[in-house]
Amino acid sequence: MILDVPLPGIEPWEEVKANPVLWHVGFHQTPNVPEKLLAGRQFVNFREGIFHRFTANSRSITDADVTHYVKSYAAPTQLRAGMEFYRPFPANEKFNKEQQSPVDVPIVLAGGDKAFGQLIPRMAESLRKNGCTHVTTEVIKDSGHYVVGEQPTIVAELIERYASI
């Protein structure tokens, strides 16, 4: 299950990359800089820079939730690991664009209706064109990017529904 993220190299990836709202992707890919600028500022980064901007209802993520994220990224190695999620995107983009072999593994694309959920049909079509034979889509209502925090019951139900496919 892929939850509310665009996939590098899978359409509409070029559109996603060009979206100025997603400036943080390039920032996080920059070696060493985000770690230095964000160290000690994780709470403000998560509360104002991330959750306030990318949730349908920023109050769905409490200060206690933010504190949990802050603790998870408190150590320099943890903060670096968080940035490393973004750094292979260029290589992933190249790989995914070149992928044409059949892929029979079931894929469930799910996204928040106020975030990447609107791109899900185009992503599914692109995956099918690239050889993925079993793609299912779901749009999670009243949710932004942080679908697990915003709609935990719905996400749990989706996982239970699709876990056996």
Q: Which sequence ranges carry the predicted segments?
A:
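Catalytic histidine-centered segment of alpha/beta-hydrolase-like enzymes
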Residues: 143-156
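Flexible "cap/lid" subdomain of the alpha/beta-hydrolase fold that forms the substrate-access gate
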Residues: 1-139, 156, 160, 164
